[in-house]
């Protein structure tokens, strides 16, 4: 049964500007080391950062919580399987809330066009 859905859209040029400004503190606050390594290794790294940020926002919206209840940006990590399909890996407070809400699965869809990155997250309940 579907528990919640969340969608978010991000302007990729914001992340291009953050990269140009070398705003490392912002990236360290928003993204795990694995996400930073993944994005930095891509030709269009701003696009990949924007997609991951949109996915984190979409997850928070799907939970109906926002960034509260002790959640941090590092509690939600966007990963890809061997075929490139995105998914979420949850840690800390996000993992605990996921279990407390009897959620069983996340579904993630990422897309981009022009200057925009969009993410949708669907949460399934047991």
Swiss-Prot record:
Domain of life where this protein originates: Bacteria
Pfam families per record: ACPS
Listed cofactors: Mg(2+)
Keyword set, alphabetical order: Cytoplasm, Fatty acid biosynthesis, Fatty acid metabolism, Lipid biosynthesis, Lipid metabolism, Magnesium, Metal-binding, Transferase
BP terms from Gene Ontology: fatty acid biosynthetic process
Substrates-to-products reaction catalysed: apo-[ACP] + CoA = holo-[ACP] + adenosine 3',5'-bisphosphate + H(+)
Principal subcellular localisation of the protein: cytoplasm
Any one Gene Ontology cellular component term annotated for this protein: cytoplasm
Enzyme Commission number, as recorded: 2.7.8.7
Binding site for Mg(2+): 8, 57
Cellular compartments annotated: Cytoplasm
Keyword match Cytoplasm: yes
GO MF, any single term: holo-[acyl-carrier-protein] synthase activity
Enzyme class: transferase
Biological role: Transfers the 4'-phosphopantetheine moiety from coenzyme A to a Ser of acyl-carrier-protein.
Protein name: Holo-[acyl-carrier-protein] synthase
Source organism per UniProt: Geobacter metallireducens (strain ATCC 53774 / DSM 7210 / GS-15)
